[in-house]
Regions:
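A short, structured loop/turn motif at beta-sheet edges
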Residues: 23-24, 54-57, 81-87, 108-117
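Beta-strand/loop substructures that line and gate deep hydrophobic ligand-binding cavities in soluble
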Residues: 16, 88-140
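Short beta-edge strand/loop motif at the mouth of beta-sheet-based domains
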Residues: 14, 34-73, 158-167
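Hydrophobic ligand-binding cavity/cleft-lining segments
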Residues: 1-46, 167
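Generic structural detector for well-ordered beta-strands
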Residues: 14-20, 54, 64, 79, ...
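Hydrophobic pocket/interface hotspot
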Residues: 26-27, 36, 61, 80, ...
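Short coil-to-beta-strand transition motifs
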Residues: 72-77, 101
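A conserved amphipathic terminal alpha-helix motif
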Residues: 124-167
Length: 167
């Protein structure tokens, strides 16, 4: 996977990846709960157990899952702010492991000769550098998983497990 770090400032994370698929295919992968359940996660790290999406401005989304390191449950949820298929999606992000912090994720999908340039900007980490670092590491993994799913059909079940130290 060729994820480029555009910037990793204290307040925001920006990454991009080129995917060899059209923007509508990528947009489906990041909005269709049945597809997200298939690719978002990796054995040994965490796995999603339920995704819900109401993809419209003001609509809600949520992901429930389990950490493979310690078996603890997690939830990430938010509200869609902008929805312009298949080129733009933005939503709030509230993660159970980050306390009450509400951040914003913006996906931009730009058609290219080779498929789609995906840009992800996750902002709102002012005063929380550890949270920014953790989310940066997470987004690098997530974009790789999504790219592998869209380009090759790789799923959580078919992806090799990793060994993560238990807490």
């Amino acid at each position: 996977m060729a994820t480029n770090v555009v910037s990793q400032e204290q307040d925001a994370i920006a990454l991009e990846v080129q995917i060899t698929a059209p923007p509508d295919r990528v947009f489906q992968a990041i909005t269709d709960p049945s597809q997200m359940l298939r690719w978002w996660g990796q054995q040994g790290i965490y796995h999603s157990t339920k995704w819900c999406t109401d993809v419209r401005p003001g609509g809600q989304w949520s992901c429930h899952g389990v950490s493979d390191a310690d078996g603890s449950a997690y939830q990430v949820s938010g509200e869609y702010l902008e929805v312009d298929p298949p080129r733009l999606l933005s939503h709030t992000w509230v993660a159970s492991w980050s306390g009450p912090m509400k951040t914003v994720v913006r996906w931009e999908l730009q058609p290219t000769a080779g498929g789609t340039l995906v840009r992800v900007n996750h902002s709102g980490f002012a005063g929380a550098p550890a949270a920014a670092k953790g989310h940066y590491e997470g987004w690098v993994r997530v974009l790789g998983w999504m790219q592998a799913f869209v380009e090759t059909g790789e799923t959580v079940a078919s992806r090799p497990a990793v060994s993560v130290p238990k807490n």
